[in-house]
Protein backbone atom coordinates (compact mmCIF):
# COMPACT_ATOMS: atom_id res chain seq x y z
CA UNK A 1 0.00 0.00 0.00
CA UNK A 2 1.30 3.46 -0.85
CA UNK A 3 1.30 5.63 2.25
CA UNK A 4 1.69 9.18 0.99
CA UNK A 5 0.18 11.66 -1.46
CA UNK A 6 1.65 14.52 -3.47
CA UNK A 7 0.15 17.44 -5.35
CA UNK A 8 2.03 17.40 -8.63
CA UNK A 9 -0.14 18.62 -11.51
CA UNK A 10 -0.62 16.70 -14.71
CA UNK A 11 -0.67 13.11 -15.77
CA UNK A 12 2.36 10.93 -16.53
CA UNK A 13 2.57 8.31 -19.27
CA UNK A 14 3.28 4.74 -18.14
CA UNK A 15 5.79 2.62 -19.92
CA UNK A 16 4.72 -0.71 -21.42
CA UNK A 17 6.86 -3.54 -20.07
CA UNK A 18 9.58 -4.54 -22.57
CA UNK A 19 8.33 -1.94 -25.07
CA UNK A 20 9.94 1.26 -26.14
CA UNK A 21 8.04 4.41 -25.27
CA UNK A 22 5.73 6.35 -27.50
CA UNK A 23 7.11 9.29 -29.40
CA UNK A 24 6.21 11.76 -26.67
CA UNK A 25 6.08 11.68 -22.90
CA UNK A 26 5.14 14.19 -20.28
CA UNK A 27 7.96 15.25 -18.01
CA UNK A 28 7.09 16.90 -14.74
CA UNK A 29 9.35 19.08 -12.70
CA UNK A 30 8.92 22.20 -10.60
CA UNK A 31 5.16 21.78 -11.07
CA UNK A 32 5.42 22.21 -14.86
CA UNK A 33 4.81 19.97 -17.86
CA UNK A 34 7.42 19.90 -20.62
CA UNK A 35 7.17 18.74 -24.21
CA UNK A 36 9.78 16.05 -24.82
CA UNK A 37 9.72 16.73 -28.56
CA UNK A 38 11.77 19.89 -28.05
CA UNK A 39 15.17 19.76 -29.66
CA UNK A 40 18.21 19.55 -27.42
CA UNK A 41 19.07 23.20 -28.06
CA UNK A 42 15.55 24.39 -27.34
CA UNK A 43 15.46 22.37 -24.15
CA UNK A 44 18.78 23.77 -23.07
CA UNK A 45 17.73 27.39 -23.70
CA UNK A 46 14.15 27.21 -22.48
CA UNK A 47 14.57 25.02 -19.45
CA UNK A 48 18.03 25.84 -18.13
CA UNK A 49 17.89 26.42 -14.41
CA UNK A 50 14.38 24.97 -14.00
CA UNK A 51 14.96 21.25 -14.42
CA UNK A 52 16.07 19.24 -11.44
CA UNK A 53 19.69 18.28 -10.98
CA UNK A 54 20.10 14.54 -10.40
CA UNK A 55 22.64 13.13 -7.94
CA UNK A 56 22.72 9.33 -7.68
CA UNK A 57 24.85 7.88 -4.88
CA UNK A 58 25.50 4.13 -4.95
CA UNK A 59 27.24 2.22 -2.19
CA UNK A 60 28.81 -1.20 -2.78
CA UNK A 61 27.95 -4.37 -0.83
CA UNK A 62 26.13 -2.58 1.98
CA UNK A 63 23.70 -4.90 3.73
CA UNK A 64 20.01 -4.16 4.15
CA UNK A 65 20.37 -4.03 7.93
CA UNK A 66 23.41 -1.73 8.08
CA UNK A 67 21.78 1.72 7.88
CA UNK A 68 20.38 2.89 11.18
CA UNK A 69 16.89 3.35 9.71
CA UNK A 70 16.85 -0.39 8.91
CA UNK A 71 17.99 -1.50 12.35
CA UNK A 72 21.73 -0.89 12.09
CA UNK A 73 23.87 1.04 14.53
CA UNK A 74 22.74 4.68 14.15
CA UNK A 75 26.17 5.87 15.25
CA UNK A 76 27.55 4.58 11.95
CA UNK A 77 25.05 6.16 9.56
CA UNK A 78 23.81 9.52 10.90
CA UNK A 79 23.91 11.20 7.48
CA UNK A 80 22.16 8.34 5.69
CA UNK A 81 19.51 8.32 8.42
CA UNK A 82 19.10 12.09 8.15
CA UNK A 83 18.55 11.72 4.43
CA UNK A 84 15.91 9.07 5.15
CA UNK A 85 14.13 11.41 7.55
CA UNK A 86 14.24 14.20 4.95
CA UNK A 87 13.07 12.06 2.05
CA UNK A 88 11.14 9.06 0.80
CA UNK A 89 12.22 5.55 1.72
CA UNK A 90 11.45 2.59 -0.57
CA UNK A 91 10.99 -0.80 1.08
CA UNK A 92 10.66 -2.94 -2.06
CA UNK A 93 13.50 -1.57 -4.14
CA UNK A 94 15.40 -4.26 -6.06
CA UNK A 95 18.67 -4.71 -7.92
CA UNK A 96 20.50 -7.58 -9.55
CA UNK A 97 22.49 -9.64 -7.06
CA UNK A 98 26.02 -8.55 -8.04
CA UNK A 99 27.88 -5.39 -9.01
CA UNK A 100 28.25 -5.22 -12.77
CA UNK A 101 24.77 -6.47 -13.73
CA UNK A 102 23.18 -3.90 -11.42
CA UNK A 103 25.28 -1.09 -12.91
CA UNK A 104 24.45 -2.21 -16.44
CA UNK A 105 20.74 -2.20 -15.62
CA UNK A 106 20.98 1.29 -14.12
CA UNK A 107 22.97 2.66 -17.06
CA UNK A 108 20.76 1.19 -19.79
CA UNK A 109 17.32 0.65 -18.29
CA UNK A 110 17.59 -2.98 -19.42
CA UNK A 111 18.04 -6.28 -17.64
CA UNK A 112 21.69 -7.30 -17.56
CA UNK A 113 21.05 -10.52 -19.47
CA UNK A 114 20.06 -8.52 -22.55
CA UNK A 115 23.68 -7.52 -23.11
CA UNK A 116 25.28 -10.51 -21.36
CA UNK A 117 26.57 -8.36 -18.51
CA UNK A 118 25.30 -11.03 -16.12
CA UNK A 119 27.74 -13.45 -17.73
CA UNK A 120 30.60 -11.17 -18.66
CA UNK A 121 30.96 -9.98 -15.10
CA UNK A 122 31.84 -13.51 -14.06
CA UNK A 123 34.12 -14.72 -16.85
CA UNK A 124 37.42 -13.43 -15.60
CA UNK A 125 38.70 -15.72 -12.97
CA UNK A 126 36.50 -17.25 -10.29
CA UNK A 127 37.30 -20.92 -10.90
CA UNK A 128 33.97 -22.33 -9.73
CA UNK A 129 32.11 -19.86 -11.94
CA UNK A 130 34.28 -20.54 -14.95
CA UNK A 131 33.59 -24.25 -14.65
CA UNK A 132 29.85 -23.61 -14.79
CA UNK A 133 30.29 -21.38 -17.82
CA UNK A 134 32.45 -23.90 -19.64
CA UNK A 135 35.50 -21.64 -19.56
CA UNK A 136 39.03 -21.83 -18.25
CA UNK A 137 41.21 -19.13 -16.79
CA UNK A 138 42.25 -16.82 -19.60
CA UNK A 139 45.69 -17.30 -21.17
CA UNK A 140 47.09 -15.87 -24.38
CA UNK A 141 48.65 -17.99 -27.12
CA UNK A 142 51.97 -18.01 -25.25
CA UNK A 143 50.30 -19.37 -22.12
CA UNK A 144 50.58 -16.11 -20.17
CA UNK A 145 47.59 -15.52 -17.88
CA UNK A 146 45.49 -12.52 -18.77
CA UNK A 147 41.90 -11.29 -18.65
CA UNK A 148 39.02 -11.48 -21.04
CA UNK A 149 37.63 -8.15 -22.12
CA UNK A 150 34.13 -7.68 -20.77
CA UNK A 151 32.11 -4.51 -21.11
CA UNK A 152 28.76 -2.96 -21.83
CA UNK A 153 28.00 -3.20 -25.55
CA UNK A 154 28.63 0.03 -27.41
CA UNK A 155 25.21 -0.14 -29.10
CA UNK A 156 23.55 0.37 -25.71
CA UNK A 157 22.25 3.86 -24.98
CA UNK A 158 23.22 4.96 -21.48
CA UNK A 159 21.42 7.27 -19.11
CA UNK A 160 24.42 9.60 -19.35
CA UNK A 161 24.00 9.83 -23.12
CA UNK A 162 20.29 10.49 -22.76
CA UNK A 163 20.77 13.24 -20.17
CA UNK A 164 23.70 14.80 -22.01
CA UNK A 165 21.52 14.99 -25.11
CA UNK A 166 18.86 16.69 -22.99
CA UNK A 167 21.32 19.42 -22.02
CA UNK A 168 22.70 18.09 -18.75
CA UNK A 169 26.30 18.16 -17.59
CA UNK A 170 27.16 14.53 -16.80
CA UNK A 171 29.85 13.11 -14.53
CA UNK A 172 30.78 9.78 -13.00
CA UNK A 173 32.79 9.90 -9.80
CA UNK A 174 33.71 6.48 -8.46
CA UNK A 175 33.45 2.89 -9.68
CA UNK A 176 32.52 2.26 -13.33
CA UNK A 177 32.61 -1.55 -13.73
CA UNK A 178 31.18 -1.57 -17.23
CA UNK A 179 34.40 -1.95 -19.22
CA UNK A 180 37.98 -1.16 -18.25
CA UNK A 181 40.21 -1.80 -21.25
CA UNK A 182 39.13 -0.70 -24.73
CA UNK A 183 38.68 3.04 -25.13
CA UNK A 184 35.17 2.72 -26.52
CA UNK A 185 34.10 1.02 -23.29
CA UNK A 186 35.28 3.77 -20.94
CA UNK A 187 32.88 6.27 -19.31
CA UNK A 188 33.76 9.32 -21.39
CA UNK A 189 32.83 7.42 -24.54
CA UNK A 190 29.49 6.45 -22.95
CA UNK A 191 28.05 9.89 -22.31
CA UNK A 192 29.97 11.15 -19.30
CA UNK A 193 31.64 14.53 -19.70
CA UNK A 194 33.78 14.10 -16.59
CA UNK A 195 35.24 10.92 -15.10
CA UNK A 196 37.04 10.23 -11.85
CA UNK A 197 37.74 6.99 -10.03
CA UNK A 198 38.33 3.41 -11.12
CA UNK A 199 37.16 1.39 -14.09
CA UNK A 200 37.11 -2.17 -12.76
CA UNK A 201 35.25 -4.03 -10.05
CA UNK A 202 37.35 -3.18 -7.01
CA UNK A 203 40.40 -1.30 -5.86
CA UNK A 204 42.64 -1.12 -2.84
CA UNK A 205 41.43 1.92 -0.90
CA UNK A 206 44.95 3.33 -0.60
CA UNK A 207 47.16 1.77 -3.30
CA UNK A 208 44.55 2.25 -6.07
CA UNK A 209 45.54 -1.16 -7.44
CA UNK A 210 43.57 -4.34 -7.87
CA UNK A 211 44.77 -7.96 -7.80
CA UNK A 212 42.73 -10.14 -10.12
CA UNK A 213 41.71 -13.74 -9.93
CA UNK A 214 44.38 -15.11 -12.21
CA UNK A 215 47.21 -17.55 -11.55
CA UNK A 216 49.86 -14.87 -11.84
CA UNK A 217 51.13 -11.69 -10.25
CA UNK A 218 48.33 -9.77 -11.88
CA UNK A 219 48.13 -6.37 -10.21
CA UNK A 220 46.83 -3.37 -12.14
CA UNK A 221 46.69 0.33 -11.28
CA UNK A 222 43.18 1.71 -11.58
CA UNK A 223 42.73 5.36 -10.63
CA UNK A 224 41.95 7.96 -13.29
CA UNK A 225 40.63 11.40 -14.05
CA UNK A 226 39.25 11.95 -17.55
CA UNK A 227 40.97 8.85 -18.89
CA UNK A 228 44.41 9.64 -17.53
CA UNK A 229 46.04 7.81 -14.61
CA UNK A 230 46.48 10.10 -11.63
CA UNK A 231 48.64 9.83 -8.54
CA UNK A 232 46.78 10.69 -5.36
CA UNK A 233 47.35 10.03 -1.71
CA UNK A 234 44.43 9.18 0.47
CA UNK A 235 41.49 6.90 1.10
CA UNK A 236 39.29 6.39 -1.95
CA UNK A 237 36.03 7.03 -0.10
CA UNK A 238 37.31 10.43 0.99
CA UNK A 239 38.78 11.16 -2.44
CA UNK A 240 35.47 10.45 -4.18
CA UNK A 241 33.72 12.83 -1.78
CA UNK A 242 36.33 15.53 -2.38
CA UNK A 243 36.07 15.22 -6.17
CA UNK A 244 32.30 15.44 -5.94
CA UNK A 245 32.61 18.62 -3.87
CA UNK A 246 34.87 20.12 -6.55
CA UNK A 247 32.50 19.18 -9.36
CA UNK A 248 29.48 20.61 -7.54
CA UNK A 249 31.36 23.85 -6.83
CA UNK A 250 32.00 24.29 -10.57
CA UNK A 251 28.33 23.99 -11.56
CA UNK A 252 25.99 26.88 -12.22
CA UNK A 253 22.25 27.24 -12.08
CA UNK A 254 21.96 27.79 -15.83
CA UNK A 255 22.71 24.17 -16.73
CA UNK A 256 21.33 21.11 -14.91
CA UNK A 257 23.73 18.36 -13.91
CA UNK A 258 23.66 14.60 -13.45
CA UNK A 259 26.23 13.18 -11.04
CA UNK A 260 26.57 9.40 -10.84
CA UNK A 261 28.59 8.65 -7.69
CA UNK A 262 29.18 4.89 -7.32
CA UNK A 263 31.49 4.40 -4.34
CA UNK A 264 33.63 1.30 -3.91
CA UNK A 265 32.72 1.45 -0.22
CA UNK A 266 32.04 -0.82 1.55
CA UNK A 267 33.29 -3.52 -0.85
CA UNK A 268 36.25 -5.56 0.37
CA UNK A 269 39.06 -5.73 1.03
CA UNK A 270 38.40 -3.58 4.09
CA UNK A 271 41.73 -3.68 5.90
CA UNK A 272 43.07 -0.17 6.35
CA UNK A 273 40.57 2.52 7.34
CA UNK A 274 41.73 6.06 8.16
CA UNK A 275 39.60 6.69 11.26
CA UNK A 276 37.12 5.27 13.76
CA UNK A 277 38.97 1.97 14.20
CA UNK A 278 39.64 2.79 17.85
CA UNK A 279 35.93 2.28 18.48
CA UNK A 280 34.63 0.14 15.64
CA UNK A 281 35.61 -2.88 13.55
CA UNK A 282 37.26 -2.09 10.19
CA UNK A 283 33.99 -2.84 8.38
CA UNK A 284 32.02 -0.57 10.70
CA UNK A 285 34.64 2.16 10.39
CA UNK A 286 34.50 1.91 6.59
CA UNK A 287 30.73 2.27 6.71
CA UNK A 288 31.02 5.35 8.90
CA UNK A 289 33.57 6.82 6.47
CA UNK A 290 31.09 6.28 3.65
CA UNK A 291 28.42 8.01 5.72
CA UNK A 292 30.82 10.94 6.19
CA UNK A 293 31.22 11.12 2.41
CA UNK A 294 27.49 11.14 1.79
CA UNK A 295 27.15 13.92 4.35
CA UNK A 296 29.83 15.96 2.57
CA UNK A 297 28.01 15.63 -0.74
CA UNK A 298 24.68 16.69 0.76
CA UNK A 299 26.40 19.64 2.46
CA UNK A 300 28.04 20.70 -0.82
CA UNK A 301 24.66 20.78 -2.56
CA UNK A 302 23.34 22.96 0.25
CA UNK A 303 26.39 25.23 0.33
CA UNK A 304 26.22 26.03 -3.38
CA UNK A 305 22.46 26.53 -3.47
CA UNK A 306 21.49 23.36 -5.35
CA UNK A 307 19.76 21.32 -2.63
CA UNK A 308 16.23 22.59 -3.24
CA UNK A 309 16.35 21.75 -6.96
CA UNK A 310 18.20 18.45 -6.75
CA UNK A 311 16.82 14.94 -6.88
CA UNK A 312 19.19 13.17 -4.47
CA UNK A 313 19.13 9.37 -4.35
CA UNK A 314 21.00 6.89 -2.22
CA UNK A 315 20.90 3.14 -2.74
CA UNK A 316 23.16 0.06 -2.87
CA UNK A 317 24.13 -2.27 -5.71
CA UNK A 318 23.21 -5.65 -4.18
CA UNK A 319 22.91 -7.46 -0.88
CA UNK A 320 25.69 -7.72 1.65
CA UNK A 321 28.16 -10.60 1.81
CA UNK A 322 26.66 -12.18 4.93
CA UNK A 323 23.11 -12.85 6.07
CA UNK A 324 23.91 -11.11 9.34
CA UNK A 325 23.99 -7.71 7.65
CA UNK A 326 20.94 -8.48 5.49
CA UNK A 327 18.59 -9.37 8.35
CA UNK A 328 15.73 -10.07 8.50
CA UNK A 329 16.01 -11.22 4.89
CA UNK A 330 17.45 -14.50 3.76
CA UNK A 331 20.42 -14.73 1.42
CA UNK A 332 23.45 -12.72 0.42
CA UNK A 333 25.08 -11.00 -2.48
CA UNK A 334 25.27 -13.34 -5.46
CA UNK A 335 21.97 -15.02 -4.59
CA UNK A 336 18.47 -14.08 -5.63
CA UNK A 337 16.98 -14.50 -2.19
CA UNK A 338 15.62 -11.21 -0.88
CA UNK A 339 18.83 -10.58 1.05
CA UNK A 340 20.74 -10.57 -2.23
CA UNK A 341 18.49 -8.32 -4.29
CA UNK A 342 16.49 -6.05 -1.96
CA UNK A 343 18.39 -2.84 -1.27
CA UNK A 344 17.84 0.22 0.91
CA UNK A 345 16.82 3.22 -1.18
CA UNK A 346 16.16 6.85 -0.25
CA UNK A 347 14.88 9.59 -2.55
CA UNK A 348 14.88 13.27 -1.58
CA UNK A 349 13.46 15.90 -3.91
CA UNK A 350 12.22 18.97 -2.04
CA UNK A 351 8.72 19.93 -3.10
CA UNK A 352 8.11 16.53 -4.69
CA UNK A 353 8.85 13.95 -1.99
CA UNK A 354 7.60 14.42 1.54
CA UNK A 355 10.03 14.08 4.47
CA UNK A 356 9.98 10.86 6.45
CA UNK A 357 7.61 8.95 4.16
CA UNK A 358 7.71 5.30 3.16
CA UNK A 359 6.52 3.56 0.00
CA UNK A 360 6.25 -0.20 -0.42
CA UNK A 361 5.66 -0.21 -4.16
CA UNK A 362 7.91 -2.48 -6.20
CA UNK A 363 10.73 -0.77 -8.11
CA UNK A 364 13.79 -2.09 -9.97
CA UNK A 365 17.03 -0.16 -10.40
CA UNK A 366 16.58 -0.05 -14.18
CA UNK A 367 13.48 2.10 -13.62
CA UNK A 368 15.64 5.12 -12.87
CA UNK A 369 16.55 5.22 -16.58
CA UNK A 370 13.08 6.15 -17.80
CA UNK A 371 12.25 8.12 -14.67
CA UNK A 372 15.32 10.35 -15.03
CA UNK A 373 14.63 10.96 -18.72
CA UNK A 374 11.07 12.01 -17.91
CA UNK A 375 12.22 14.38 -15.18
CA UNK A 376 14.87 15.82 -17.50
CA UNK A 377 12.46 16.35 -20.39
CA UNK A 378 14.62 14.07 -22.50
CA UNK A 379 14.01 11.79 -25.45
CA UNK A 380 12.58 8.36 -24.68
CA UNK A 381 12.72 6.96 -28.22
CA UNK A 382 15.63 4.63 -28.89
CA UNK A 383 16.48 1.61 -30.99
CA UNK A 384 16.69 -0.93 -28.16
CA UNK A 385 13.54 -1.56 -26.10
CA UNK A 386 13.91 -0.99 -22.38
CA UNK A 387 12.67 -2.80 -19.29
CA UNK A 388 12.60 0.46 -17.36
CA UNK A 389 9.27 1.88 -16.17
CA UNK A 390 8.45 5.50 -15.40
CA UNK A 391 8.14 5.76 -11.62
CA UNK A 392 7.41 9.47 -11.29
CA UNK A 393 3.77 8.75 -10.48
CA UNK A 394 4.67 6.39 -7.66
CA UNK A 395 7.50 8.48 -6.28
CA UNK A 396 5.93 11.90 -6.56
CA UNK A 397 2.15 11.53 -6.58
CA UNK A 398 1.48 8.48 -4.45
CA UNK A 399 0.23 6.34 -7.32
CA UNK A 400 0.55 2.56 -7.28
CA UNK A 401 3.73 1.16 -8.76
CA UNK A 402 3.37 0.25 -12.44
CA UNK A 403 5.80 -2.63 -11.89
CA UNK A 404 4.54 -6.08 -11.00
CA UNK A 405 7.38 -8.17 -12.47
CA UNK A 406 11.15 -8.35 -12.10
CA UNK A 407 13.37 -10.85 -13.90
CA UNK A 408 16.42 -11.22 -11.69
CA UNK A 409 18.17 -13.99 -13.63
CA UNK A 410 17.65 -16.15 -16.70
CA UNK A 411 19.58 -19.23 -17.76
CA UNK A 412 23.16 -18.92 -18.94
CA UNK A 413 24.62 -17.20 -15.89
CA UNK A 414 26.03 -18.84 -12.77
CA UNK A 415 23.02 -17.90 -10.66
CA UNK A 416 19.56 -19.40 -10.41
CA UNK A 417 16.93 -18.28 -12.93
CA UNK A 418 14.56 -16.16 -10.86
CA UNK A 419 11.43 -14.13 -11.51
CA UNK A 420 9.05 -12.23 -9.28
CA UNK A 421 5.53 -11.69 -10.54
CA UNK A 422 3.13 -9.96 -8.19
CA UNK A 423 3.44 -11.53 -4.75
CA UNK A 424 5.19 -14.69 -5.96
CA UNK A 425 8.85 -15.37 -6.66
CA UNK A 426 10.06 -18.44 -8.51
CA UNK A 427 13.72 -19.17 -7.82
CA UNK A 428 14.73 -22.27 -9.74
CA UNK A 429 12.43 -24.91 -8.27
CA UNK A 430 11.56 -22.86 -5.20
CA UNK A 431 8.40 -20.77 -4.89
CA UNK A 432 7.80 -18.11 -2.26
CA UNK A 433 4.96 -15.72 -1.51
CA UNK A 434 6.92 -12.55 -0.83
CA UNK A 435 3.89 -10.70 0.52
CA UNK A 436 3.12 -13.22 3.26
CA UNK A 437 6.62 -14.69 3.60
CA UNK A 438 9.14 -11.93 2.78
CA UNK A 439 11.88 -13.79 4.64
CA UNK A 440 11.47 -16.84 2.37
CA UNK A 441 11.14 -19.44 5.08
CA UNK A 442 8.65 -21.73 3.33
CA UNK A 443 8.86 -23.18 -0.17
CA UNK A 444 5.28 -23.49 -1.43
CA UNK A 445 6.02 -24.93 -4.88
CA UNK A 446 4.41 -28.29 -4.10
CA UNK A 447 1.20 -26.56 -2.99
CA UNK A 448 0.92 -24.33 -6.05
CA UNK A 449 2.03 -26.22 -9.16
CA UNK A 450 -0.18 -23.95 -11.28
CA UNK A 451 1.72 -20.85 -10.17
CA UNK A 452 5.05 -22.62 -10.70
CA UNK A 453 3.98 -23.59 -14.21
CA UNK A 454 2.84 -20.07 -15.04
CA UNK A 455 5.96 -18.36 -13.71
CA UNK A 456 8.27 -20.90 -15.33
CA UNK A 457 6.56 -20.35 -18.66
CA UNK A 458 6.97 -16.59 -18.28
CA UNK A 459 10.61 -16.99 -17.30
CA UNK A 460 11.26 -19.20 -20.32
CA UNK A 461 9.56 -16.61 -22.53
CA UNK A 462 11.88 -13.90 -21.27
CA UNK A 463 14.85 -16.28 -21.34
CA UNK A 464 14.32 -16.71 -25.08
CA UNK A 465 14.94 -12.97 -25.48
CA UNK A 466 18.59 -13.28 -24.48
CA UNK A 467 20.57 -12.46 -27.63
CA UNK A 468 23.22 -14.81 -29.02
CA UNK A 469 26.52 -14.48 -27.19
CA UNK A 470 28.50 -14.01 -30.36
CA UNK A 471 32.24 -14.41 -30.53
CA UNK A 472 34.29 -15.46 -27.54
CA UNK A 473 35.43 -12.36 -25.64
CA UNK A 474 38.76 -10.89 -26.70
CA UNK A 475 41.77 -11.10 -24.43
CA UNK A 476 43.66 -8.15 -23.04
CA UNK A 477 46.87 -7.45 -24.88
CA UNK A 478 49.42 -7.07 -23.38
CA UNK A 479 48.39 -9.81 -20.95
CA UNK A 480 49.68 -8.08 -17.81
CA UNK A 481 49.07 -4.34 -18.18
CA UNK A 482 50.29 -1.82 -15.66
CA UNK A 483 47.16 0.30 -15.76
CA UNK A 484 43.63 -0.15 -17.07
CA UNK A 485 42.72 1.67 -20.25
CA UNK A 486 44.51 0.40 -23.35
CA UNK A 487 45.74 3.87 -24.34
CA UNK A 488 46.73 4.76 -20.78
CA UNK A 489 48.83 1.59 -20.67
CA UNK A 490 50.81 2.46 -23.81
CA UNK A 491 53.20 4.71 -21.94
CA UNK A 492 52.44 4.67 -18.21
CA UNK A 493 54.47 7.04 -15.99
CA UNK A 494 57.43 5.64 -14.09
CA UNK A 495 55.86 6.25 -10.70
CA UNK A 496 52.96 4.03 -11.72
CA UNK A 497 55.13 1.18 -13.00
CA UNK A 498 57.27 1.29 -9.88
CA UNK A 499 54.21 1.17 -7.64
CA UNK A 500 52.71 -1.80 -9.49
CA UNK A 501 56.00 -3.71 -9.62
CA UNK A 502 56.47 -3.19 -5.90
CA UNK A 503 53.09 -4.75 -5.14
CA UNK A 504 53.46 -7.54 -7.69
CA UNK A 505 56.65 -8.61 -5.96
CA UNK A 506 54.60 -9.42 -2.87
CA UNK A 507 51.97 -11.49 -4.69
CA UNK A 508 52.06 -15.29 -5.01
CA UNK A 509 53.10 -16.55 -8.41
CA UNK A 510 49.95 -18.64 -8.60
CA UNK A 511 46.77 -19.20 -6.65
CA UNK A 512 45.97 -22.53 -5.08
CA UNK A 513 43.21 -24.46 -6.91
CA UNK A 514 39.84 -22.89 -6.24
CA UNK A 515 41.26 -19.92 -4.39
CA UNK A 516 41.06 -16.27 -5.30
CA UNK A 517 42.56 -13.16 -3.74
CA UNK A 518 39.16 -11.63 -2.94
CA UNK A 519 36.43 -12.95 -0.62
CA UNK A 520 33.47 -14.52 -2.34
CA UNK A 521 29.81 -14.73 -1.39
CA UNK A 522 28.35 -18.06 -0.25
CA UNK A 523 27.13 -20.33 -3.03
CA UNK A 524 23.43 -20.38 -3.83
CA UNK A 525 21.45 -23.62 -4.17
CA UNK A 526 21.40 -24.97 -7.69
CA UNK A 527 18.27 -24.45 -9.73
CA UNK A 528 17.23 -24.48 -13.36
CA UNK A 529 14.43 -23.64 -15.70
State where each predicted segment sits.
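N-terminal export signals
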Residues: 2-5, 16-36
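Long, internal low-complexity/basic segments
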Residues: 3, 8-10, 24, 41-52, ...
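C-terminal cap/loop subdomain of S1 sulfatases and analogous C-terminal strand-loop tails that border
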Residues: 193-194, 198-204, 320-325, 333-338, ...
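Short, structured active-site-proximal loop/turn typified by the sulfatase FGly-forming signature C/S-X-P-X-R
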Residues: 73-104, 109-113, 169-171, 193-199
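A short beta-strand-to-alpha-helix junction
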Residues: 49-50, 72-77, 94-98, 146-157, ...
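Histidine-centered active-site microenvironments of extracellular/periplasmic hydrolases
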Residues: 75, 182-191, 269-274, 279, ...
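Beta-strand elements within well-structured catalytic alpha/beta cores of enzymes
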Residues: 51-63, 82-83, 92, 106-108, ...
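Formylglycine-dependent
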Residues: 122-169, 177-257, 263-272
Amino acid sequence: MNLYLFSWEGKMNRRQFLKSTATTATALFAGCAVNNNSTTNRIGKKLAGSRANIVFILSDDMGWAEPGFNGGNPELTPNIDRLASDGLRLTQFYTHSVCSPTRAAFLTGRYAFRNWMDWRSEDFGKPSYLEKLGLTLAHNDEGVPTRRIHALDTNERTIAEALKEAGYFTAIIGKWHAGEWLKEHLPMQRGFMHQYGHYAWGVDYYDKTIPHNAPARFVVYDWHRNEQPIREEGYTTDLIAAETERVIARQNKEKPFFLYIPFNAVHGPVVRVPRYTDKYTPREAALKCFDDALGRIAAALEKHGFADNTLLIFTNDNGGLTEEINKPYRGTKNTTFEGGVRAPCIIRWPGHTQPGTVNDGMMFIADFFTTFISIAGGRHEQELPVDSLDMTGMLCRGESSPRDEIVFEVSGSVRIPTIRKGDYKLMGKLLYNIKTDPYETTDIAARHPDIVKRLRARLMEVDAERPPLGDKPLLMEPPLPYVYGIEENENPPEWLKEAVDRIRATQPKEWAPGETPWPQAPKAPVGSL
